[in-house]
């Protein structure tokens, strides 16, 4: 048994021990935030409803709250004791709802205001990772006045163009020629004021879920993603039965460990907490892993990856949800950000 497998089993055992000693009533009245106003609303509804049903199945006094249909300030009148955030993208994963919950003094799942705001900004995230010596593809911020030929000279082809603040591959284009760059920029700019282009790393697409905070944070098993036609777009992420997910990955123990170490460092340098998921590309020529993005509010749908990794540790979906919520009991007043 590898060291990573041993650590995984230990984490699963700690989760089970935590839940065995958990007083459900101590959680009080729980609000599950779902839906929202971002381009990922549909996925958030799927995640949130799954979370809500899981909590109800465990006897938690849980209630859904959709800030896309209601004014978020109405949270103040709901008398919730804590919040499970199942929102994705802007106005849910970017520090805004976290700031409101801080003002309301409501403990919540996921990262705090600063880490959330940093992680959703792909450019700010890259700057922090690079300053900490973590590998991530070369990039440029694009504008309508960008010199497309200079961009290609810097980043090479193919390259990736995407909105700086969107997730779920929304507005993402794989550009194979300089002539395709203007249209790719316009597509991304239609969703976001900031657009990023980055070198396309060709190789295995991986993701690594993470849990915990600070020095006690841990990396869960790496998952290898094999989408149809090597296209892991919005549809193939959430609705396709053709996308394959390998856990274990079939890669060497050394590569899995390197990816986990990189993902964990990425999580810690951003100051993330509770849980997250780092997306990584493994260069097929060099075997070097490159960080793409950090998700601070990962999906919890039937196709989602964090539940898949947790299951490898013997932690079922409903238990994972309950454990994540239980972590809000550890948050201290004034120390949540």
Curated annotation (Swiss-Prot):
It catalyses: 2 D-alanine + ATP = D-alanyl-D-alanine + ADP + phosphate + H(+). InterPro entries: ATP-grasp, ATP_grasp_subdomain_1, D-Ala_lig_Van_CS, D_ala_D_ala, Dala_Dala_lig_C, Dala_Dala_lig_N, PreATP-grasp_dom_sf. It is an enzyme of class 6 (ligase). SUPFAM superfamilies: Glutathione synthetase ATP-binding domain-like (SSF56059), PreATP-grasp domain (SSF52440). Pathway: Cell wall biogenesis; peptidoglycan biosynthesis. Binds 2 magnesium or manganese ions per subunit. It is found in: Cytoplasm. The keyword Cell wall biogenesis/degradation applies. The keyword Metal-binding applies. GO terms for biological process: cell wall organization; peptidoglycan biosynthetic process; regulation of cell shape. Belongs to the D-alanine--D-alanine ligase family. This is D-alanine--D-alanine ligase. It comes from Polynucleobacter asymbioticus (strain DSM 18221 / CIP 109841 / QLW-P1DMWA-1). The lineage of its organism: Bacteria, Pseudomonadati, Pseudomonadota, Betaproteobacteria, Burkholderiales. The gene is ddl.
